[in-house]
Curated annotation (Swiss-Prot):
Organism: Rattus norvegicus (Rat)
Tissues showing expression: High expressed in testis and weakly expressed in lung, intestine, and spleen. Not expressed in spermatogonia, spermatocytes, and round spematids in adult testis but specifically detected in elongated spermatids.
Any one GO biological process: mitochondrial protein catabolic process
Renumbered residue ranges of the record's region Interaction with YWHAG/14-3-3 protein gamma: 1-290
Location of region: Disordered: 110-150, 171-214, 234-313
Biased segments, Polar residues type: 129-138
Residue stretches of biased makeup (Basic residues): 257-283
Gene: Spata18
Family of the protein in this entry: Belongs to the MIEAP family.
Coiled-coil residue spans: 152-184, 210-243
Family matches, as Pfam families: MIEAP
Modified residues (Phosphoserine): S13, S85, S123, S127, S154, S157, S303, S305, S527, S541
Name of the protein in its database record: Mitochondria-eating protein
Keywords carried by this UniProt record: Coiled coil, Cytoplasm, Developmental protein, Lipid-binding, Membrane, Mitochondrion, Mitochondrion outer membrane, Phosphoprotein
Length: 556
């Protein structure tokens, strides 16, 4: 191939091709048409000779490359050129003569590739056949291991079953021995009973009817007490109904205190009749009946229905939570309206209501403890040796929650508020304005102590870290302040879980700037009747004496 290439490089036709093209280009304008055509044909003939030599060199080069080399180059570059560039017959003959070796080379390469593929498939099949026995052997060993493990597991389970059978046999023997001993003891008891039956048993026969009669008498006494309570309730309701029907409306304009005084007179008559009937029916068990002062105001009196004990704890809890929520949303706002007529500062009003709520819970819990002690003393003689004594005490308390002396608790709360240094204000204002609110909170707190577990309010102190789990900030708070300035409403807790969130006011730096030395507060004497004007402002000056400084933290 190298010799042919050297001959082509030194051939006259290849060397004179460039010179002829240059001469033709220079003489093209002066030559005639025939002369130009002759020049062009001469160049084509010379180029054809060069191409024939190049194809010979191409064939030799492809043969030197072997079966696989140069195939892609010929396919991608030479074949498209041959299809588009040469259309004349003479050139076609030359191409056919030169292309045949290339086609033979392509055919040989295809045959070679197919033979290589067949050899590869055959080698793969031989390797699979060789690896199949080893795979079968591995499967056999694995199945043998599984069989051995199953055998060991079955042996272990068999041993466990045998051990369990032995234990059951031992238990059966012990039970048989116990049964034999029981039969022997029963036979001995029968023999003793038969011996004792021969003795006179008049005394024993006389004791049994006495026990039955005493039980019937206790049951009859309880029924009579319930009947007396219900009859007193009925008579009180009938009397109040007759009074309301006999009372005619006045033609003139009524004063602002008319409806409130009328409601208080009705509640006073009802409470008086109920307390009188209960003191009559429970004279043996209750030594002190409820006091009925002229200023007694009962916010919500619940009838002592016998079905009260049957009410589930969940239903009572839901009702009390609803009452507590109503007290926050309605009764608290009413109390604020009353106090705002006398006090300008909203902070002082909210502090007064919060302290009243805390004191009411504290006093109600103390009253519940004393009430439970009295119930225990009363029920002890009739439940001696019984296992359900605590259940009986709880049922009695739930059934007789209306025996709670709420007015006495209201008086105690007002006394505690009078000596609290945080809410000292001018003497023209009296805490008797909050009697209805305090009485409602006391009744709610007293009833919450009868739940299982009881509900209580969370401890709160000014300056404590704000807890989002217990309180929500009021609308006028600084939402970036970390400390509580003062509390608006306490949080309701069940053990350590928050049932209802309270409300607190947070202000950054306000707690330290408003701290002032604690002054001695002036105690307020509490009279049964609170003289007030239209808005609860006292028109009669009352004597006040200095009292010692008390701890300002909330009591629980």
């Amino acid at each position: 191939m190298a010799e042919n290439l050297k001959k082509l490089a030194q051939s006259e036709s290849f060397l004179s091709l460039q010179d002829k093209v240059c001469f033709w280009a220079n003489d093209y304008q002066t030559n005639s048409c025939d002369q130009n055509l002759n020049c062009c044909i001469e160049l084509i003939e010379q180029v054809a000779k060069v191409q024939a030599q190049l194809f010979a060199i191409l064939t030799a080069t492809a043969q030197e490359g072997g079966h696989n080399e140069g195939v892609e180059t010929i396919k991608s570059r030479l074949l498209p050129l041959l299809q588009t560039s040469f259309s004349s017959l003479g050139v076609g003959k030359i191409i056919q003569t030169e292309i045949r070796p290339i086609q033979d080379f392509q055919l040989r390469s295809k045959n070679r590739q197919s033979s290589l593929d067949q050899e590869q498939q055959q080698s793969d099949g031989d390797s699979f056949i060789e690896s199949q026995p080893t795979q079968v052997q591995d499967d056999l060993t694995e199945s043998g291991k599984n069989l051995e493990g199953t055998k060991n597991g079955s042996a272990i389970s068999l041993l466990a079953a045998e051990e369990e059978i032995n234990q059951l046999k031992k238990q059966l023997k012990s039970l048989q021995a116990q049964e034999d001993a029981r039969h022997k003891t029963s036979e001995n008891r029968r023999a003793e009973i038969s011996r004792t039956d021969r003795r006179p048993s008049g005394k024993r026969n006389s004791e049994r009817p006495q026990d039955v009669v005493s039980n019937y008498e206790k049951h009859l006494k309880n029924l009579k007490d319930e009947i007396a309570v219900l009859s007193a309730e009925k008579s009180g309701l009938q009397a109040s109904h007759r009074q309301t029907r006999s009372r005619s409306p006045s033609p003139g304009p009524r004063g602002p205190r008319g409806p409130r005084g009328r409601r208080r007179s009705r509640s006073h008559s009802r409470s008086h009749s109920r307390s009188h009937s209960r003191s009559h029916s429970h004279s043996n068990s209750h030594s002190n009946s409820r006091s009925n002062s002229p200023c007694t105001t009962v916010a919500k009196i619940r009838s002592p229905s016998p079905n009260r004990s049957k009410m589930s704890s969940v239903a009572r809890k839901a009702a009390l939570l609803s009452r507590f929520s109503d007290a926050y949303s309605q009764a608290r706002l009413d109390a604020q309206c009353l106090l705002r007529r006398c006090i300008d500062r909203a902070e002082t009003v909210q502090r007064i209501i919060y302290i009243a709520t805390v004191e009411a819970f504290h006093i109600a819990k103390m009253a519940f403890r004393h009430f439970k002690i009295r119930v225990r003393k009363m029920l002890t003689p009739s439940h001696v040796g019984s296992n359900d004594f605590e259940t009986a005490v709880s049922d009695y308390i739930v059934c007789h929650l209306d025996l709670y002396d709420s007015q006495s608790s209201v008086n105690d709360v007002i006394r505690a508020m009078n000596v609290n240094p945080k809410i000292s204000f001018p003497p023209e204002v009296d805490f008797c304005l909050l009697t209805d609110f305090i009485q409602e909170i006391c009744c709610i707190a007293f009833a919450m102590q009868s739940l299982e577990p009881p509900l209580d309010i969370a401890f709160g102190a000014d300056g404590e870290v704000f807890n989002e789990a217990k309180y929500r900030r009021s609308y006028d708070s600084d939402f970036t302040a970390p400390l509580v300035f003062y509390h608006v409403w306490p949080a309701l807790m069940e053990n350590d879980c928050v049932i209802m969130k309270g409300e607190a006011v947070t202000k950054r730096g306000a707690f330290w700037t408003t701290v002032r030395p604690v002054m001695r507060c002036r105690s307020r004497s509490l009279s049964p009747i609170c003289p007030r004007s239209r808005f609860g402002i006292s028109t009669v000056s009352r004597s006040r004496s200095p009292s010692p400084i008390r701890c300002t933290f909330a009591r629980y």
